[in-house]
Amino acid sequence: MARIITVGKASSKYSVIIAKNTLTKANLLSHIKTKNKVLIVTDSGVPKKYLNEVKEILKNKKKYYVHVLEKGEKSKSFSSYITIQEKLADLKFDRSDCMIALGGGVVGDITGFCAATFLRGIDFIQIPTTLLSQVDSSVGGKTAINIKQGKNLIGSFNNPSLVLINSKFLETLSEKEFNSGLGEVVKYAFIGNKKLYKLLKDNSESIKNRQLKILEEVIEESIKTKSKIVTEDEKESGIRAILNFGHTFGHAIEAFNKYKNITHGEAVIIGMVI
């Protein structure tokens, strides 16, 4: 049975659906039934079978297009942003159309920012494929790109209209990417979710072995923690700053390593220790 969490205030609330497989016609098509065209943004690191699943659902139902970014933080750039915006313009997208972010945090961030700024805002859907993006970046509405002076310096707050979390995607993650996501999970346990802390402590082997039912509970508790905070403080003017625990040093560590050899989650873990 799917787990459903509602995030945000009445004027901007959206649903997060968590299950082994949320990529169904019922979930996706019912949400975009009034949309005319769809641009799927993904990257070269996302298994093609996931993209094919989305395309199969949209086939014969919606006019869709695909934009594939190069895998990695370097794609969260002004150049990639302009390329996507020009593609939307060339395809004559308007406010009756939407975007789908199929990938990790980089894909979600740049897609959300493009959606926020094209025609001053079109809808977008998050389909996160990594643990880190499932528990963190797909929820809360932060979208951004990087510039040479720093990470996430150009961006906006833009909530998705829907988040579909497939726990089965975690089966294909590398060990390094999976552990990176756990860094953000541990953060949520440390900033006040006692149930999540106990869940992690009591089920460490099951989590390590990627038992999906346990992982779905871990994801749910992580998102509940974030949801409560971002609903109260949508624009990071107060309590939301607690979500940056570990990130001040973490971002510096990532930048020092030129975003190579160390993942975001690993950097956050080190940042929390510091």
Predicted regions and their residues:
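Phosphate-handling active-site elements
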Residues: D90-S96, L119-Q126, A255-E266
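ATP/NTP phosphate-donor binding region
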Residues: M1-C98
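Glycine-rich beta-strand-to-loop/alpha-helix junction loops that act as flexible
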Residues: K71-G72, L102-G104, F245-G246
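Short glycine-rich anion-binding loops that position phosphate/pyrophosphate groups of nucleotides
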Residues: S44-V46, G104-V107
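Short glycine/serine/threonine-rich phosphate/pyrophosphate-binding segments
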Residues: V106-F113, Q134, H251-A252
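A glycine/threonine-rich phosphate-anchoring loop and its flanking beta-alpha core
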Residues: G8, S15-I17, L23, F113-N203
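Active-site segments that bind and position negatively charged phosphate/pyrophosphate groups
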Residues: K198, D202-I274
